[in-house]
C-alpha cells in the first residue's frame, strides 16, 4: 500500500483542529479545544474567525450555501447536527439529533442526502432532512473522517486509534449490492476529518495542531 504524498502541512487556525470542509473557495475548520469555526483561504492561509459553536465541532460538510456541523453538546457529548450560515453563525431551526441516541462524528453530502459516520460502530448512515436513517454502509475499520468524491466515499480509517496507523479507504456503494471497499493509501499520523478541494485532500493532524493537504492517490 502506498503512503500518502503530503503537499502542505500548515498550522491550524485554532488548537486541536477537528471538523473540516471545503465550500469551493474556502476551507472550514472547527477547533475541538476552542469550539470555534474558522474560514481559511487555502492559498494564502489567511483565516477568519467565524465565531463560537454551541458545542464541540466534530465534523462538517457543505450543503448549498450553508454548512452542516455535528456538535457535541452538554456533559454527555450528545451529537447534534446544526445549520451554520457563513457570516451569520449557527441557527436554532432544523437541528437533528444524531442516530443511536446522538452518536456520530463526521458528515458528508452528495447533493441529495446527508451522511454521518460513526467511529466505533464502523459505519456510514444516510439521513433524510428529519434525521431518519436510510442506507447503512458497514466498513472494516473505525472511521475518523469521510467525504464524497466522484460518487464514492473516501474515509480516514484506523484499526486502533492509539497507534499512528491510519488508512485512506475508498468505498463505492453505488451498485446497490455489497459495497466495494479498498484501502488505497496509508497515513502515519492521527488524522481527523477529511475534505476534498477538487484536486487534493485535506485533513487535520489534531494533536500537532496542523492541517495537512495530500495528493489524491487514485487520480
Which role does the model predict for each range below?
Residues 5-11, 45-51, 90-98, 132-137, ...:
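A short beta-strand motif characteristic of beta-propeller blades
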Residues 11-24, 54-63, 70-72, 98-111, ...:
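Beta-rich, blade/repeat-based domains predominating
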Residues 23-24, 33, 63, 77, ...:
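Short loop/turn segments that connect beta-strands within the blades of beta-propeller domains
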Residues 29-34, 69-77, 116-121, 155-163, ...:
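Conserved beta-strand positions in repeat-built beta-propeller and related beta-rich domains
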Residues 31-45:
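Beta-propeller domains
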Residues 36-39, 76-82, 123-125, 163-169, ...:
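Structural motif
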Residues 41-45, 84-89, 127-132, 172-176, ...:
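Short loop/turn segments that connect beta-strands within beta-propeller blades
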Residues 190-219:
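Blade-level signature of beta-propeller repeat domains, shared across WD40, Kelch, NHL, RCC1
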Amino acid at each position: 500500500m502506498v503512503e500518502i504524498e503530503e503537499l502542505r502541512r500548515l498550522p491550524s487556525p485554532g488548537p486541536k483542529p477537528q471538523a473540516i470542509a471545503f465550500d469551493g473557495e474556502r476551507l472550514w475548520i472547527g477547533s475541538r479545544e476552542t469550539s470555534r469555526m474558522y474560514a481559511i483561504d487555502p492559498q494564502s492561509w489567511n483565516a477568519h474567525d467565524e465565531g463560537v459553536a454551541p458545542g464541540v465541532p466534530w465534523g462538517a460538510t457543505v450543503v448549498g450555501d450553508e454548512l452542516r456541523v455535528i456538535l457535541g453538546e452538554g456533559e454527555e457529548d450528545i451529537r447534534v447536527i446544526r445549520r451554520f450560515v457563513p457570516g451569520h453563525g449557527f441557527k436554532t431551526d432544523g437541528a437533528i439529533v444524531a442516530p443511536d441516541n446522538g452518536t456520530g462524528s463526521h458528515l458528508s453530502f452528495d447533493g441529495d442526502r446527508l451522511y454521518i459516520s460513526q467511529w466505533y460502530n464502523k459505519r456510514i448512515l444516510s439521513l433524510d432532512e428529519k434525521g431518519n436513517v436510510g442506507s447503512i454502509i458497514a466498513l472494516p475499520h473505525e472511521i475518523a473522517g469521510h467525504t464524497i468524491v466522484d460518487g464514492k466515499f473516501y474515509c480516514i480509517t484506523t484499526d486502533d486509534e492509539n497507534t499512528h496507523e491510519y488508512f485512506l479507504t475508498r468505498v463505492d456503494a453505488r451498485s446497490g449490492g455489497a459495497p466495494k471497499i479498498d484501502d488505497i493509501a496509508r497515513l502515519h499520523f492521527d488524522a481527523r476529518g477529511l475534505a476534498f478541494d477538487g484536486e487534493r485532500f485535506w485533513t487535520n493532524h489534531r494533536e500537532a495542531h496542523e492541517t495537512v493537504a495530500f495528493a489524491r492517490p487514485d487520480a
